[in-house]
Amino acid sequence: MGARGTGGVPPTRAAGAAEFRIDLVRTQGQFILDGQRFDVENNNWLVGNDEEVLVIDAAHEAGPIIEAIDDRRVVAIVCTHGHNDHINAALDVHGFVGRVPIALHDDDRMLWNQIYVARGPDLPLKDGQTFEVGGATLGVFHTPGHSPGGVCLYLESEGVLFSGDTLFKGGPGATGRSFSDFPTIIDSIRTKLLTLPPEAVVHPGHGDSTTIGEEAPHLEEWIARGH
């Protein structure tokens, strides 16, 4: 069963005519790659206000995500990368909300195709791309390493980064499987994420939230540790 929570989400604020908010929906399932299966709990983030919302990842169970969407207009379903545990509810959510784009970076299309053969994503994500929702703007950072097409989304007005599986509390995402590379993820984190303000809150695709300031001092430790 999915669960809703705040996960350290900042307080809501007024944005235009409706109150801006960030919702967290946790869902459970399996991550499957290279013939292995792992039980996981995913963070699905919904960003917007009472009128419209952007869905960041749609994992495992569409029902709790749809419940959190409620009657809001969905701007897009953005997949931070193509691993099954971040996209396997995307089509079911899409089927409920109607004609909205499912967005994924082209470099992760081969991962998408492992799950969905007959239908591709609608919108290719690109570095520097932006999404407007609830009076706020989210910018896309291409952060390869965990997968070739991994992305993060930065909500600058709130000082919030949605990091997918690129950065977690305690270090970078795993790079010991197909299509991943440790030096690449370190470069992504160093050049794209650790340059953000130290107070920026990091909401990852799994586990607890953190801040850039909490993680930045440990970069050399991560490099020494390796993947």
Please state what every model-predicted region is.
Residues 4, 9, 109-114, 182, ...:
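Short polar/charged helix/loop
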Residues 7-8, 13, 70, 79:
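An N-terminally biased module of ancient metal coordination in phosphate/nucleic-acid-related enzymes
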Residues 15, 25-27, 47, 127-133:
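Short acidic-hydrophobic surface loop/beta-edge motif
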Residues 19-72, 152-164:
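Conserved beta-strand hairpin/beta-sheet module of binuclear metal-dependent hydrolase folds
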Residues 39-40, 53, 60-137, 217-225:
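Active-site HxH/HxHxD metal-binding segment of metal-dependent hydrolases
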Residues 47, 57, 81, 93, ...:
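Divalent metal-coordination and catalytic microenvironments
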Residues 53, 139, 148-227:
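Metallo-beta-lactamase
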Residues 55-57, 75-83, 102-105, 142-145, ...:
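Active-site neighborhood of phospho(di)ester-bond hydrolases with catalytic His/Asp-centered motifs
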